[in-house]
Amino acid sequence: MNYLILGAGPAGLTVATKLKQRGEDSFLVLEKEREAGGLCRSAMVDGYPLDIGGGHFLDVRRPKVNEFLFRFMPKEEWNIYIRNSQIKLNDLFVHHPLEANIWELPENLQKEYLVSISNAGCNLNTPMPDTFVEWIRWKLGDRITDDYMLPYNQKIFSDTLNELGTYWLDKLPNVSYEETLESCKKHKAYGTQPGHAQFYYPKKTGYGELWKGMADYLGNKIIYNVNVKRINFVEKNVNSLDGDCFHADVIINTIPWKEFDEFIGMPEELVDKISKLKHSSIETRYFPHDLDTEAQWIYYPDSTLPYHRILVRSNFCMGSRGCWTETRKERVCMFSEKINPEFRFESEYAYPLNTVGKQEIIKELLNWCEKHQVYGLGRWGEHQHYNSDVVVERGLKLVDEL
């Protein structure tokens, strides 16, 4: 066999689909679950689709990616939305990102935030710190840091935030005192919009239906319920938990590296580094009541609440009702035992954590693997917090390179 693809999430499906479109027939996809889609799967809950891996949408910003995907769910089957995401600060709701929407706060709070921003290290030209917590404080000022950024990131990623690096925060813009002041005077947001400022969501189904369409196109090229646990870099094969062996000239891995129990032929020091990769696990749980809001998702930095985010399904899934919460696994115990959700699902691998030293580990790992014709791809193959549209783009690029 020419190509073996591990995982039938967006990354694996994209590579397999592109190979087939190019006339390649000697390939196979191995999937642990009984259906394709990975974190982007959907389930019917209370009569409408719910995205079990959390909030996943199709960004409008990559037309070539969307053109590729619309072959499996035509453009006319999607609605397009302008993102409405909000943050709940105590009893107030402010649009996300907070630093661009200080003007929505009461005037007394605007003044406090403005003073804090003026004293941020990046605005005083003080040296850039090395630790995550102090870097955030240097970049955004004390108020945004303490009221939102630190408590929210603790809820979604880790209680010990300084295990995170700062190398992935460069995309955060400096918070300008002058621009924030002008924003407050004009009652208008400033700066660039976050990802998914505009997004597509299916009119009649969940996001998972897109990936099912790709899986249907691949047909028997996907084998389900195969839990790969061993990879042999010498013999170019993998073994499943059931003992089945699959061989290929090129192996494309899109599953978490920590899912492997054994790495034959890999240096022990590199195997040890893989064990240092970290991730967070997220539970989604559905509640049938509607929220009185136009927001599609709401961020909750309040540390007394277990969940960090609510997705308001009725505001992007036509005709539906209800909402779902997203909660880091370690905080699920904070829910009252009296609260019995109609549906819950836990994603063990939800977010790869950008820990100190991670980028060096991944660079060394991927470079070594490529020398043995094994390629890491996607959120888990590259251990990067990629959204599905980015994953598809990278999958298409990899096929071109191969």
For every predicted segment, state its role:
Residues 20-45:
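Glycine-rich FAD pyrophosphate-binding loop
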Residues 11, 35, 258:
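Conserved Rossmann-like nucleotide-cofactor binding loop
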Residues 2-29:
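N-terminal Rossmann-like FAD-binding beta1-loop-alpha1 element of flavoenzymes
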Residues 92, 110-234, 244-247, 254:
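Active-site/ligand-binding neighborhood in enzyme catalytic cores
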Residues 42, 97-98, 312-402:
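Conserved flavin/dinucleotide-binding core of flavoenzymes
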Residues 22, 227-343, 364-368:
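Mid-domain catalytic core of redox enzymes
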Residues 46-124:
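Dinucleotide-binding Rossmann-like beta1-alpha1 core, especially the glycine-rich loop
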